[in-house]
Amino acid sequence: MAEAAQQEQQNFAIQRIFLKDVSFEAPNSPNMFQKEWNPDVKLDLDTQSRELGEGVYEVILRLTVTVKNEEETAFLCEVQQGGIFTAGQMEEAQLAHCLGAFCPNILFPYARETISSLVVKGTFPQLNLAPANFDALFMNYLQNQASETAEAPAEAPAEA
């Protein structure tokens, strides 16, 4: 009975998944198509969340893919994949993990598909991004925050 009450309090639901922003640039085409294809792929990930209402949150996953070929930019693709989630009655640490890792895990396949589609429409070889471990990224973020806090110099007491 107590477990049922706890599960009822810690509800989670996806309200909506949406594409917030998208950009595709191929600054060196069509010249890029005449070169041997040996790409150097750089992926940047970022997440952001904000509360929309009581227990309702918007989470944005930003992916930026920059592909260079022979030191020239072949293409740059930026996607902001958004989601609106209900996350009620969670402890602060659980909510932070939910918004910083669990929700981005849900959004990533949608963003990955959008990037793949844009790359193919640009007539470049298909780009399949490997899955991201948002749990590990979130833990790394927490460790960095903790070490920054520990390294921050203590403020000198104000003199009277």
UniProtKB/Swiss-Prot annotation:
<keyword id="KW-0963">Cytoplasm</keyword>
<comment type="subunit">
    <text>Homotetramer, a dimer of dimers. One homotetramer interacts with 1 SecA dimer.</text>
</comment>
<comment type="function">
    <text>One of the proteins required for the normal export of preproteins out of the cell cytoplasm. It is a molecular chaperone that binds to a subset of precursor proteins, maintaining them in a translocation-competent state. It also specifically binds to its receptor SecA.</text>
</comment>
<keyword id="KW-0813">Transport</keyword>
<dbReference type="GO" id="GO:0051082">
    <property type="term" value="F:unfolded protein binding"/>
</dbReference>
<dbReference type="GO" id="GO:0006457">
    <property type="term" value="P:protein folding"/>
</dbReference>
<dbReference type="GO" id="GO:0015031">
    <property type="term" value="P:protein transport"/>
</dbReference>
<keyword id="KW-0811">Translocation</keyword>
<dbReference type="GO" id="GO:0051262">
    <property type="term" value="P:protein tetramerization"/>
</dbReference>
<dbReference type="InterPro" id="IPR035958">
    <property type="entry name" value="SecB-like_sf"/>
</dbReference>
<dbReference type="Pfam" id="PF02556">
    <property type="entry name" value="SecB"/>
</dbReference>
<dbReference type="InterPro" id="IPR003708">
    <property type="entry name" value="SecB"/>
</dbReference>
<keyword id="KW-0143">Chaperone</keyword>
<keyword id="KW-0653">Protein transport</keyword>
<protein>
    <recommendedName>
        <fullName>Protein-export protein SecB</fullName>
    </recommendedName>
</protein>
<comment type="similarity">
    <text>Belongs to the SecB family.</text>
</comment>
<dbReference type="GO" id="GO:0005737">
    <property type="term" value="C:cytoplasm"/>
</dbReference>
